[in-house]
């Protein structure tokens, strides 16, 4: 039991004092203690098990994929999970150097600020398609936030001299401060604006 209490993420960052502020995301963001965020896909076996996967591992998983753009996906981060984890680890060190804060806390704030509350869905009624505003479940909110962060970082870093780690660190800091300069926060606001117009 004493060993579990002393587990530090990447042997550096303590997860015990981090709190999820958004009450809707408390069940969806897992801050389970582990040294290396790698569960070998155990969370994929059951339907809602991904809620138990550490939020850092879920970010690393999202960083392995580049949306639906085939040309940008081919040959890059294709299942190279340790490469993705090392990218996140280096970005965390940059965040700590720039802000002096625990980078996992910065990630949690970034996810909270990038998670949309409303989305739209299509309803076909009498042969006509209507877009209707719907509330988003906590698990999908976290999924969308992580996707917005990963896609925004990859898009910004594509064919740029600056490294992916630096872009990820900058993006997480901006999103944690809830500034619209962060592409994930901008995307969230756009999604909620469209949903508000579809009410």
From Swiss-Prot:
One of its GO terms (molecular function) is structural constituent of ribosome. Keywords: Ribonucleoprotein, Ribosomal protein, RNA-binding, rRNA-binding. SUPFAM superfamilies: Ribosomal protein S7 (SSF47973). InterPro entries: Ribosomal_uS7 (IPR000235), Ribosomal_uS7_arc (IPR026018), Ribosomal_uS7_dom (IPR023798), Ribosomal_uS7_dom_sf (IPR036823), Ribosomal_uS7_euk/arc (IPR005716). Coiled coil: none annotated. It comes from the Archaea. One of its GO terms (biological process) is translation. Belongs to the universal ribosomal protein uS7 family. One of the primary rRNA binding proteins, it binds directly to 16S rRNA where it nucleates assembly of the head domain of the 30S subunit. Is located at the subunit interface close to the decoding center. PANTHER family: RIBOSOMAL PROTEIN S7. This is Small ribosomal subunit protein uS7. It comes from Cenarchaeum symbiosum (strain A).
């Amino acid at each position: 039991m004493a060993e579990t209490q002393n587990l530090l993420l990447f042997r550096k960052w303590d997860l015990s004092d981090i709190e999820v502020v958004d009450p809707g995301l408390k069940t969806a963001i897992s801050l389970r203690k582990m040294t290396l965020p790698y569960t070998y896909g155990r969370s994929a076996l059951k339907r809602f098990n991904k809620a138990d996967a550490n939020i850092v591992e879920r970010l690393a998983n999202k960083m392995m994929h580049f949306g639906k753009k085939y040309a940008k996906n081919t040959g890059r981060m294709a299942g190279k999970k340790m490469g993705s984890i090392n990218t996140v680890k280096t970005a965390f060190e940059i965040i700590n150097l720039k802000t002096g804060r625990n980078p996992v806390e910065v990630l949690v704030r970034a996810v909270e600020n990038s998670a949309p509350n409303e989305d739209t869905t299509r309803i076909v009624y009498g042969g006509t398609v209507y877009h209707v505003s719907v509330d988003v479940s906590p698990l999908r909110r976290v999924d969308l936030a992580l996707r917005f962060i990963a896609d925004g970082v990859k898009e910004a870093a594509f064919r740029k001299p600056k490294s992916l780690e630096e872009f990820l660190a900058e993006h997480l800091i901006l999103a944690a401060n809830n500034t619209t300069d962060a592409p994930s926060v901008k995307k969230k606001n756009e999604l909620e604006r469209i949903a508000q117009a579809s009410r």
